[in-house]
Amino acid sequence: MNIQEAKEEIKRTVEAYHKRDEDGSYKIPVEKQRPLFLMGPPGIGKTAIVEQVAEELGINLISYTITHHTRQSAIGLPFISKKIYGEKEYSVTEYTMSEIVASVYEQIERTGIEEGILFLDEINAVSETLSPTMLQFLQYKTFGMHRVPEGFIIVTAGNPSEFNKSVRDFDIATLDRLRKIDIEEDFQSFKSYAYQAGVHGAITSYLEIKKDRFYFVKQDIEGKRYVTARSWEDLSKLLQVYEELQYPLEKELCQEYLADPEVAEDFTLYYSLYQKYREIYHVPDILEGAEIKETRLFLEAPFDEKLSLLSLLTDALQIAFTDYVKKKELLSRIFRFLKSMKEKLSEVSVSQALEEEIKRQRKRMATLKEARMLSKKEESIRLQLIQMFGDFYSALKERNSTEDTGNREDRKENEADFSLIKDCFRVKEEERQQEVEKTGKMLSNALNFLGNTFGEGQELLLFLSELTKSPYALGFLSDVGNETYSRYNQYLLLKDKQKALQEEAKEVLRS
C-alpha cells in the first residue's frame, strides 16, 4: 500500500486497540494486540505518518531506533537482590527498569495522557543478542521484567535487505506475532501530504513533470545515488528560508539533499525557471481579478511551463486556505472559552479568568513541547491564542484605567468587562469573514482566468484535481463553498460522463 493508506491503517488500528468495553477493559486484550511492522524503503515517510497519527489522535509518541540500543539499555542493568524461598535466603539476579519502558512512564507523567504509541525503527536489524528479547517484547510488551503500560500500542518499522546489509529476515515465530504492512513509494500520495506539510511548489511541480525522480536508489561504479521523499521535504524547508533571506540556490547545495548529480543539476535549472515564471506571470494580479492582456503568452507556453503556472496559483491559494483553517480553529477555541467564562461570571472576574487562561495555555504549550507532541501548526495556533487573550486583557486594563469603575457593583462590572471581550471577539470574527470572502474571490478569479484562457481543457482539469488533493482547500470548500468552483467542477464531471457514454455507445455499435 502507499504511505497514505498505511497512515489510515495505523490510525484505525490504534483506535481499535484503544476501544474499551463497558467495564473499562480493552476489547482486544494486550497479548492479542499485534504490533504493526511497517516494511518499506528508507525516506518514504514511515516515521512521519506515525507522528501524524499520534498528533491527530492527541496521544503520546515515544520513538527509538532499536539498533542504537544494547541488551543492557533495552532490558535494564542486572543487580543482585535477596529472596527467601522455603525459609531459606537466596541471592537472585534482577534488572533495573529498561530505558525504553522508563521513558514511556516519564512521558505519561509529563503529559498526563496514559495512551500512546511506542515506535521502534529498524527492528529487523537488531543484533543477535537482542533477538530473544525482541521476540518476548513483541508478544508480551515487556523488556526484561518490566511491561510497557497497557495504553501504549507498539508500531515498528524496518527496511528491506537491499537497503540495509544488517537486516535479517524474521523467522515464522516472530512474523506470526506481527501485522506486516508493505509500503511502496508513491508520488500521488506524497502530494497529498506535501500540501498539508507546505512543501515548496517548485518541488511538487517539478516532480509532476518528472515523476521518476521522486524516489530511487541506484548503485553504480561511483557509489550509491539516491533521492527520497525525505530529501525533497528537507530541501523544501531550506528553500523556503533561503527565499526569505534572498539567497540563491546552487547545484552544490541541492546535491547535499539530492544525492544524484544529474537530479540536483536538473532541479537547480528548473527552480531558476520557476522563479522566472513567478515574475512573468503576475500571479497576484490573476488572483485579484485584474485584466490580463498577455493571454497569448500562456496559450503558447510549453506544457511544463503551464504546469509551473498552475503550481504558482495553487501555492498562493494554499497559503490562504491554510490561514483559513488555522483562523477557524483559533476563533473556535476562543468562542469555547468565552462560553465557559460566561457561565462563571458570578464566581470569577473576567480579568482573572483571562490571566489564568493565559498561564494555563503557556504551561500546556511548554508541556507539549517538552513531550515533543507540539506540531508546527498547533504551536502557531497556541501562540496566536495566547496573543489574542493578551490583547483582550490589555483592552480591559486600558478601558478600566480611563473609566471610573469604583461605584459599579462587581457583578455589573464583570458583565461590562465580558461585553467588551465579546466586542473584541466580534471584531476578530468580522476580520476573519472578510478574509474568507477574499479567499473565495481569489479562487474564483483563478478559475475564471484558467477557463477564459484555456477553455475547459486539461489545464483547468489539472487545477481542479490539485485542489482536491489539499486537505486545507477541501476544508475551505466544504465549510464555505464556492459557486465558481462548483460550476466548473460540475461541468467537467458532466463532460466526463458524456464522454464515457459516447465510448460505451461506440462499443455497442462495434459489437
Report the location of each language-model feature:
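Glycine- and charge-enriched loop/helix tracts that form the active or gating conduit
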Residues: K180-E185, V227-R230, K237, K293
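Conserved AAA+ ATPase small/helical "lid" subdomain
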Residues: K32, S192-D260
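Long, charge-rich low-complexity segments
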Residues: L273-A301
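Terminal-proximal interaction/regulatory segments of ATP-powered molecular machines
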Residues: L299-S511
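Conserved helicase/translocase motor-coupling segment
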Residues: L249-Q275, Y281-P284
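Non-catalytic, well-ordered alpha-helical scaffold segments
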Residues: P132, A229-E233, E265, L307, ...
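Intrinsically disordered or highly flexible coil/loop and linker segments, enriched in small
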Residues: D23, E244-L245, K276, I280
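AAA+ P-loop NTPase catalytic core and its hallmark functional loops
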Residues: M1-D212, V217-D220
